Design a protein with these regions (language model features):
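Short N-terminal helix/helix-N-cap motif within the alpha/beta-hydrolase-1
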Residues: 42, 67-68, 93-95, 149, ...
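Short, hydrophobic/aromatic-rich segments at coil-to-beta transitions
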Residues: 34-39, 129, 138-140
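Bacterial Sec-dependent N-terminal signal peptides
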Residues: 1-20
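Conserved beta-strand hairpin/beta-sheet module of binuclear metal-dependent hydrolase folds
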Residues: 24-75, 153-166
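Metallo-beta-lactamase
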Residues: 57, 64-65, 138-198
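Active-site HxH/HxHxD metal-binding segment of metal-dependent hydrolases
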Residues: 65-138
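Short glycine/proline-enriched coil/turn segments at helix->beta-strand junctions
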Residues: 54-55, 77-80, 96-101, 157-159, ...
Length: 198
């Protein structure tokens, strides 16, 4: 499993090095990672992804602080947009206020009072195996509790891409104290992820 995660991290690094910047301000730099895929790198070293299909687009995570994120996304794509948070921590869901509807896993609703109590929009709940069909491109939800109870990864199986938030990929095991996730839960998610990567 460590070998697979290392390969994934190296591939991501190689793609990021060759990325072309399409937008930059003091809070975020947006780069074209590959065709119809942009990475948003923020001042606090978190990342968001914009994935575009033929019919619509998906923004994965919203970062901590990025003024007018909706307008920045609108400069890149004019397609209807779905917004998904990989988990309900402020560095991944801090700018949900710019969007009327946000997809999250129901298990992370325990974090909403602490991290998104002021959100005026609507939460939509995604489930294991749910597919977001963008037109010519699909993202499948895989529930990976551990970092938070509702952590998810999004798999673009056709292109071999995985968008994991903080569930995996940082090189560290980062479990949270409140709410506490048993190490066994994280281990189960690691085993499931390893199977998905094969």
């Amino acid at each position: 499993m460590k070998r697979n995660l290392l390969i994934f991290a190296l591939l991501f690094l190689c793609m990021a090095i060759g990325a072309q910047t399409v937008f930059k301000n003091e809070e975020v730099e947006v780069s074209l990672l590959k065709e119809k895929t942009w990475v948003f790198s923020t001042w606090d070293y978190t990342t968001m992804y914009l994935i575009e299909g033929e019919d619509k687009a998906v923004l994965i995570d919203t970062g901590t602080r990025c003024a007018d994120l909706d307008k920045i996304v609108g400069q890149i794509t004019g397609k209807p947009l779905e917004v998904i948070v990989t988990h309900m921590h402020p560095d991944h869901a801090g700018c949900i206020k710019y969007f009327d509807k946000v997809w999250m896993h129901r298990a992370d609703t325990v974090l909403v009072p602490q991290h998104a109590a002021d959100y005026q929009g609507e939460f939509l709940y995604m489930e294991e195996g749910q597919v977001f069909d963008l037109g010519g491109r699909k993202l499948e939800v895989a529930w990976m509790p551990g970092h938070t109870p509702g952590s998810v990864v999004l798999l673009d199986k056709a292109n071999g891409d995985c968008y994991s938030g903080d569930a995996f990929g940082s090189g560290e095991v980062w479990l949270q104290c409140v709410p506490m996730s048993p190490i066994a839960t994280f281990h189960e998610s690691c085993c499931r992820m390893e199977k998905l990567m094969k």
